[in-house]
Design a protein with these regions (language model features):
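Structural signature of the two symmetry-related core transmembrane helices
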Residues: 113-128, 202
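C-terminal membrane-cytosol helix-exit motif in multi-pass small-molecule transporters
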Residues: 3-28, 212-219
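Helix-to-loop junctions at the C-terminal end of transmembrane segments
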Residues: 97-110, 192-193
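Extracytoplasmic gate region of multi-pass secondary transporters
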Residues: 41-90
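A membrane-interface helix-boundary motif in multi-pass transporters
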Residues: 1-6, 187-208
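Short hydrophobic/small-residue motifs within alpha-helical transmembrane segments
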Residues: 54, 91-97, 178-180
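Intracellular juxtamembrane helix-capping segments at the cytosolic ends
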Residues: 149-164
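Juxtamembrane intracellular "pre-TM" segments in multi-pass secondary transporters
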Residues: 24-50
Length: 238
């Protein structure tokens, strides 16, 4: 399997080296910007709030995926190489598939409402996974991925839509927040060593809760465009 990945990696490198791409002229908003731009952004409270929100989201994603197999093995006796691995695969699969459902929901509802609903759904699944029986836990863990799938794009869009300038620099700051994916799983493990893995994974209540709050305090400059279903129904009737 690793040889297959290595082959395709080398193939992609070769294609990129042989391809000719047009030269892109970045606008002022798209450029990374000067040190002064970053200082200006660092003085904005909303920038830090979204930075920690992105930190929390990536922590949720990796913190869940990294410990699913161990939890199912430790508390329910599932084989980590079969059932555990399958649960992790389903988590990532639903995390991907849920993006398509998110596209539909964002055409109907305000992005903040979608984020609130997804956060509550993820918290419910987390509770079922941590405290439910084996038959529920093995399903609830992957289901977290379905609800988490819409969080990344919504948080990113709300963040960039909350500042009027320096979007390129702000994007760089948000990208730095992916360090949460490296730190949160370690925190879960450290807490788990002291009070048990269930207690460690309970840290995800804090990170998912952080995402939930965005739906209440976010104030985007422009709201996402949604379909007016009542108007569409009236027009169809006439």
């Amino acid at each position: 399997m690793y040889w297959t990945f290595a082959f395709f990696t080398l193939l992609m490198i070769a294609v990129l080296l042989l391809s000719r791409f047009p030269q892109v002229q970045h606008t002022t908003e798209e450029r990374a910007g000067s040190l002064e731009m970053y200082r200006a952004l660092a003085r904005k409270r909303v920038v830090w709030m979204y930075f920690f929100a992105m930190f929390a989201y990536v922590g949720c994603e990796q913190g869940t995926a990294d410990w699913i197999s161990q939890f199912l093995s430790q508390y329910h006796g599932f084989d980590p190489h079969t059932t555990g691995a399958t649960a992790v695969s389903w988590f990532w699969g639903l995390l991907t598939a849920g993006c398509f459902l998110g596209l539909l929901l964002l055409k109907i509802f305000d992005s903040r409402k979608v984020l609130i609903g997804a956060s509550f759904g993820a918290l419910f699944c987390l509770s079922a996974a941590l405290f439910g029986p084996a038959s529920v836990s093995v399903i609830a863990f992957p289901a977290i991925g379905l609800f988490a799938s819409v969080m990344w794009p919504i948080v990113i869009s709300l963040a960039l839509n909350s500042v009027a300038e320096h979007h390129g620099s702000f994007s760089g700051i948000l990208s730095t927040a992916i360090i949460g994916g490296a730190l949160v799983p370690v925190i879960i493990g450290r807490v788990g060593d002291r009070i048990g893995l269930r207690g460690g994974l309970a840290c995800l209540y804090l990170t998912f809760g952080c995402i939930l709050t965005i739906g209440f305090w976010a104030k985007p400059l422009i709201n996402n465009t949604t379909l007016n279903l009542k108007k569409a129904s009236a027009e169809a009737a006439t």
